[in-house]
């Protein structure tokens, strides 16, 4: 049910030309209950750990993990992506966030995916907690870990503020676009 609502929301957003304004001003969203979101986040992490064992080793060194179990992205020239997530500190749900992006350019389709950001130091956690929305690419450095990068990382070579893993991709999105993702705290 949550996935269907997310897809409908993303499709509706993709059809508006005021996408960046409309999604940036939505401070509170209720796509899933707190219990559902916590369960989905924990299940997503377990699935991530089974497919990327390095992520589990990374979790033991991380100060916190920001998990977005289901991001829905859709577009036809104008596009958008939305999902809600939870910040886990010490393995427990602490705060809730949304992930929003708008895009324009040559693109068509819809897809869903999840991602987890491992915040490796107090600086990264503090930035997330005190910022009025974290725009990826501004603030702490984030390294997106793919299969190739994972092979070259070890717990002794970790130097960046945050590491992100994208998982559970479904659907098809043909896209060459300008995108930015903003993570903002939501009330739960």
Q: Where are these predicted regions, by residue range?
A:
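N-terminal secretory signal peptides that target proteins for export/translocation
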Residues: 1-3
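Hydrophobic alpha-helical targeting segments used for export or membrane insertion
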Residues: 5-13, 17
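C-terminal segment of classical bacterial N-terminal signal peptides
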Residues: 15-28
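Small-residue-enriched, tightly packed secondary-structure blocks
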Residues: 30-188
């Amino acid at each position: 049910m949550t996935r269907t609502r997310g897809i409908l929301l993303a499709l509706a957003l993709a059809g508006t030309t005021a996408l960046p304004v409309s999604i940036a001003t939505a401070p509170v969203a209720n796509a899933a209950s707190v219990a559902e979101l916590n369960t989905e986040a924990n299940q997503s992490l377990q699935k991530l750990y089974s497919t990327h064992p390095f992520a589990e080793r990374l979790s033991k060194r991380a100060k916190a993990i920001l998990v977005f179990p289901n991001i829905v992205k859709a577009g036809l020239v104008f596009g958008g992506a939305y999902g809600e997530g939870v910040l886990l500190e010490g393995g427990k749900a602490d705060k809730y966030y949304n992930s929003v992006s708008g895009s324009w350019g040559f693109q068509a389709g819809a897809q869903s995916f999840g991602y987890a950001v491992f915040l490796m130091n107090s600086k990264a956690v503090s930035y997330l907690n005190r910022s009025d929305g974290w725009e990826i690419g501004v603030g702490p450095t984030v390294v997106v870990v793919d299969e190739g990068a994972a092979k070259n990382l070890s717990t002794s070579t970790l130097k960046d503020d945050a590491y992100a893993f994208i998982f559970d991709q479904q659907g098809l999105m043909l896209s060459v676009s300008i995108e930015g993702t903003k993570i903002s705290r939501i009330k739960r």
